[in-house]
Structure formats: C-alpha cells, structure tokens
Amino acid sequence: MLVVAFVSFSLFNFVGDPINNMVGEETSDEERAELRETLGLMDPIHVQFSRFVVNASKGEFGISYQLRRPVSDLIVERLPATIELVVISALIALITGTLLGVYTGINRKGFLSDIILAVSLLGVSLPTFVIGILFIYLFAVILGILPSFGRGEVVDLGFWTTGFLTVTGLKAIILPSVTLSLFQMTYIIRLVRAEMMEILQTDYIKFARARGISENSIKYKHALKNGLIPVITIAGINIGTLIAFSIITETVFQWPGMGFLFIQAVQFVDIPIMSAYLVFIAFVFVMINFIVDILYYFIDPRIRIKGDISSG
C-alpha cells in the first residue's frame, strides 16, 4: 500500500499545477507562490509524501483544493453511493453469471447455450461506456422508463445515505449496476462453464454415476459444489475491481460516488482527493484478498488437509 501511495503521489506532481485552477488569471506570481507555500507544494516530494502518510494514518487526507473541504468528509459522503452500486453489481454478476455458467456447462451443445455464449462476448468486447450510453439511449431516451443520470431520492440514516428505500432510488441504480456488472458476469459465465465441463469428466463423477446416483444430484450437488470454489475467489477479487473501475460507470451515469469524485479531482488536479482515492482502493484490495484467503481455507477441504499434513 505504501508503494502504491508513493508512486501515485509522485505521478500526481506531473499532472499539472493545481494553483492554476484555484486562482484567476489576475493573481500575481507572489500570491501564487504564497499559496503554494501555504499548501506545502514547495516542499520536496518525499516531505509531502511523509506528511500525507502521517496524516492518513490518523484518517486525515488534507483539504480538497477544489471544494475547500476535508477529503475524509467527502469520502464519507460519496462512499455509500459507490458501495451500493458495487454490491448490486457484484450480486448481479455472481448470481446471473453462475446460473448461466452452470446451464451452458451442462448443456454444452444446446442452442440456447450458444446464444448465451455469443451474447456474453458483447460484455467482453464492448467498452463499458459504450454499453452505458446504449442503455441510456434505449431505456431512458426511447422507452423513458428509467432515469439516465443521478442517484434518485435518497434517505439519510445518519451514518449512511441510501437509495434502496425510495422508488426513484431503486430505479436509478438499475442501469449503472447492470452496466458495471456485465464484464464480470461474462467472465464468471465462462469460468463456471469451464469448471463444470472439467469436473463432469473427472473420475469421481463417473464413479458417482456408476453407483446409481441421480444425474441431478451429480450435477447440482457434487459437481456444482466443487465448481464454485474458484468462483468465490474471483468474486471476492472482482469486488475490488468493481470499485476501481466504477469510475467509468459513475461518470457516464453521473452517479455521485467516489469514482465520479476522482474524475472531478483529476480534472481539477486535486492531489489530496486523488491520493486518498488510490490509497483507499489499495486498502480494499488488500482486505478483500485477506478475507478471500480465509474463506478459501474453510470452503476447500484440500487446503485444510494440506495444512493438517504439514502441521503434523
């Protein structure tokens, strides 16, 4: 995480001068220099970075150059929108991808399986912003049944703002969540399909058939259980990926989350927000990988057996 923070912090010093966006053309060079000194921009990079790390360890990421507000407050405000979008997208990708993957893995030569695999190529081939624009044009412009931007009406619960408790909020999250989930969904479809096809050819499945176990029990109890083990790993990592790549989706749909805040920060060269965002993403990936490793140990008996053998 420190490496990610340092590299990103160093690169941000070459994206432009934030002072140009903070003051007008009539501002004198002396006033610009004084503002740089006040913000600490005249200090060497390693000094700025050390100050950033010390403050970040206390939950302080500085003041936004653009909004003149503490970055930590901005993150707290925008985080609920991103979390809700990512959670819904992850559920759509995991549930739909698993069901379609199982179906195409069991019915390998079916006509519907070919259609599903062909359509899934669109999720991989088309960029996210193109899919988002197409959805907006179809469902918001032509049909007019879903909103094209924004989060809708939200309810303030004190520590959290949610759109799940309002009709407009639920309608507003449909298009961006489906758009964000498509790429991960197609990946899960192909992963589950490949796992099911491989497992159905293994010796213990053939032995189960020889014992007279029903075909449905073999497919949906024995094969599916083992086929979902790698999916859990991918699904966990995909949550971090969805948060990182929600930038494009949030920008297309003007979704007021952290990704949209990051894009605005890049346009304004708001270094405190950009640095805090990337540190947050790195932290999310570290924590998700840690949790997935723990879940993997409890789900996959082979890992427990290896651990018992090595400890014994």
What are these regions (language model features)?
Residues 118, 122-126, 130-185:
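Membrane-water interface segments at transmembrane-helix boundaries in multipass membrane proteins
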Residues 3, 7, 11, 15, ...:
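Alpha-helical membrane-inserting segments
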Residues 14-15, 123-126, 243:
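Transmembrane helix irregularities
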Residues 8-12, 132, 136, 140, ...:
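Juxtamembrane/transmembrane-helix interface segments of polytopic membrane transporters
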Residues 42-98:
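An internal, D/E-rich "acidic patch" concept
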Residues 2-50, 143-165:
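Hydrophobic alpha-helical transmembrane segments of membrane transport/permease proteins
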Residues 31, 35, 45-61, 71, ...:
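Hydrophobic alpha-helical segments of integral membrane proteins
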Residues 79-112, 160-312:
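Alpha-helical transmembrane segments of integral membrane proteins
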